[in-house]
Amino acid sequence: MPTPHTFSRELRLLTPEHFKRVFAEPVRAASPQITLLACPNTLEHPRLGLAVPKKALKRAVWRNRVKRVVRESFRLNQASLPAIDIVVIAKGGVKEMDNEELFKLLEKLWRTLSRRCNG
């Protein structure tokens, strides 16, 4: 497993097949601004994929900010997550949130997802 608190290539969902697997039978944790989908993986660590559509967040600056905050939150919380593949889907309401609010919301969603995936 990679050292704690990194976000290396092996911690990312990279191919369309990885994303399709998560979308096929997901465990959900959602808020009006963000949805997290997850499914178990055969690895010993969680992996993250991001879906931040232009339709929800028109400006690249907004999309990049959301991705940056999600990656940082995942990086700091990955040790407490089970071996699951996670796809984060941003919705339009996320652009009104500041970084601190988004970070707190993500921590709550990580805990919810962890509980649902562990039984």
Swiss-Prot record:
Keyword field contains Magnesium: no
InterPro entries linked to this entry: Ribosomal_Su5_D2-typ_SF (IPR020568), Ribsml_uS5_D2-typ_fold_subgr (IPR014721), RNase_P (IPR000100), RNase_P_CS (IPR020539)
Gene3D superfamilies: 3.30.230.10
SUPFAM superfamilies: Ribosomal protein S5 domain 2-like
Catalytic reaction list: Endonucleolytic cleavage of RNA, removing 5'-extranucleotides from tRNA precursor
Domain of life: Bacteria
GO biological process assignments: tRNA 5'-leader removal
Any one Gene Ontology cellular component term annotated for this protein: ribonuclease P complex
EC number(s) recorded for this UniProt protein: 3.1.26.5
A GO term, aspect molecular function: ribonuclease P activity
One Pfam family, short name: Ribonuclease_P
Record's keyword terms, sorted: Endonuclease, Hydrolase, Nuclease, RNA-binding, tRNA processing
Family named by the database record: Belongs to the RnpA family.
Cited function: RNaseP catalyzes the removal of the 5'-leader sequence from pre-tRNA to produce the mature 5'-terminus. It can also cleave other RNA substrates such as 4.5S RNA. The protein component plays an auxiliary but essential role in vivo by binding to the 5'-leader sequence and broadening the substrate specificity of the ribozyme.
Quaternary structure note: Consists of a catalytic RNA component (M1 or rnpB) and a protein subunit.
Name this protein carries in UniProt: Ribonuclease P protein component
Organism: Aeromonas salmonicida (strain A449)
